[in-house]
């Protein structure tokens, strides 16, 4: 239902029973009452988790995130400490509309609509350039059976090159590619906190392993996760969109166990998809094309996939974090 509030806030309480739509609300930014804190519409309170979390994560249209305090006082719930930073970084103006899509945990994807009634991208995340310092950081593919079309971009040409393997951009791969086989991988040679394999960057902040294969990566990706201790990997829009690849090396390094079906979790809700496990331990998850289409991914977007595991350490879901125009900003 829609309920207009005295502070020009409104809320749309979309049911999650179908699993297709996440709850959301919208508000109008008024500087005199929303510059340092923002009240959440009362009509939305029954959808807030209980007990009320102390903090929430706001994810902007440009891929950045803000941690804000959630407080309850005088029977109202507010975004407080940290909200002022969100306002300043996104340069919010009087009368602009903001929509908040809740993921059911603690994150809200926030969209901003300017005076022209169009969704705007603001506070774009900066993507750092990382060069490979040693020959060990170059990877080559020795067997065609290890090549996935997932690693091919839309603008690929017909020549041979080495693949740098953090999230692939459209001009980073040309034709036939080379990547190191799993048998050549030596964990003890990896110096710090992430492992990058085939078209993905793999990150686990709790380990001390890192390998840099791709020149571009999202800076500090674990900061954007629901749980910074979760394993995650980075990918992008590719020609082969019908399945999402979880590389064998990632599965081996973190002992990932996949159930026969997992859920994608994005701003539209949950989508259950079938997993296919290969002999070399790589895992493919179908219905990825639907995720790409309903989120309208472009070649300039980067996608951070957060792996969610249950108490038995079995993977049950992939949480999608979208970084709009991240590649274009480099």
From Swiss-Prot:
**Compartmental location:** Nucleus
**Mind naming one GO cellular-component term on file for this protein?**
nucleus
Q: Which GO terms describe its molecular function?
A: DNA binding
Acidic residues compositional bias, start-end: 129-138
Q: Which Pfam families match?
A: B3
Q: Which SUPFAM superfamilies match?
A: DNA-binding pseudobarrel domain (SSF101936)
Q: What are the protein's UniProt keywords?
A: DNA-binding, Nucleus, Transcription, Transcription regulation
Q: Where in the chain is the DNA-binding region found?
A: 23-116
* InterPro entries per UniProt: B3_DNA-bd (IPR003340), DNA-bd_pseudobarrel_sf (IPR015300), Plant_B3_domain (IPR050655)
Superkingdom, natural source: Eukaryota
Q: What is the lineage of its organism?
A: Eukaryota, Viridiplantae, Streptophyta, Embryophyta, Tracheophyta
Region of interest: Disordered: 129-169
Biased segments, Low complexity type: 142-162
Name it: B3 domain-containing protein REM21
Q: Which gene encodes it?
A: REM21
